[in-house]
Amino acid sequence: MGSEQNDSTSFSPSEPKLCVKGCGFFGSPSNMNLCSKCYRDIRATEEQTASAKAAVEKSLNPNKPKTQPQQSQEITQGVLGSGSSSSSTRGGDSAAAPLDPPKSTATRCLSCNKKVGVTGFKCRCGSTFCGTHRYPESHECQFDFKGVAREAIAKANPVVKADKVDRI
C-alpha cells in the first residue's frame, strides 16, 4: 500500500525527447522541446525580425520636428478636455526619444592583438594599446606630438611686436 502512494505522488521518469527540429540533440520542455542551439537560433531570428519591423515602421513614419502650429493644436485639444488624446501625445513623445548609439570600444592592443579590456591605454593617435605598447616609442606612433605642442604654445602665447619708432 505504501508503495502505491509513493508511485502516485512521485514524478514518473520520462524519456528525454529529441529536438523538434530534428537536429539529433535532446530538447527540453522549457525551450519548447528544442535543443539549446535551435532555441537560441529561433530567439535570434525573432529579435531580428522585430527590430526590422521597428526600423520599417520608423522609416515609414519619420519623426517630424515640432513647430508652433502643432503645439497650438495640442494645446487646443488639451483645452477641449480630451484627456485620452493628451495622454497619447505624451506617450508618443517618450517613444520618439532618440536612443544613444552603442559605443564601439577597442578591446585589443593594436600592436600585439592582446585583450586589454578596461585597462587599455588610449593613445593620442586614436588607438588602444596594452601596458607594454602604451608608450609612443613602443608602438611606433605616427602622431606629431611636437607639432601639436608648438601650435598649442603659439596659440596660448601670441607674439607681440612693437611698432617701429620713427627717427627724428
Curated annotation (Swiss-Prot):
PROSITE patterns reported for this sequence: ZF_A20, ZF_AN1
GO molecular function: DNA binding; zinc ion binding
InterPro entries: AN1-like_Znf (IPR035896), AN1_A20_ZnFinger (IPR050652), Znf_A20 (IPR002653), Znf_AN1 (IPR000058)
Span list, region Disordered: 49-105
Pfam families: zf-A20 (PF01754), zf-AN1 (PF01428)
Zinc finger region(s), A20-type: 13-47
AN1-type zinc finger span: 103-149
Biased composition (Polar residues): 60-76
Start-end of Low complexity biased regions: 82-94
Positions with a binding annotation for Zn(2+) 2: C109, C112, C130, H133
Keywords, in A-Z order: Metal-binding, Zinc, Zinc-finger
Chain positions recorded as Zn(2+) 1 binding sites: C19, C23, C35, C38
Transmembrane segments: none
Binding sites annotated in the UniProt record for Zn(2+) 3: C123, C125, H139, C141
Domain of life: Eukaryota
Protein role: May be involved in environmental stress response.
Protein name: Zinc finger A20 and AN1 domain-containing stress-associated protein 1
Lineage, uppermost ranks: Eukaryota, Viridiplantae, Streptophyta, Embryophyta, Tracheophyta
Gene of this entry: SAP1
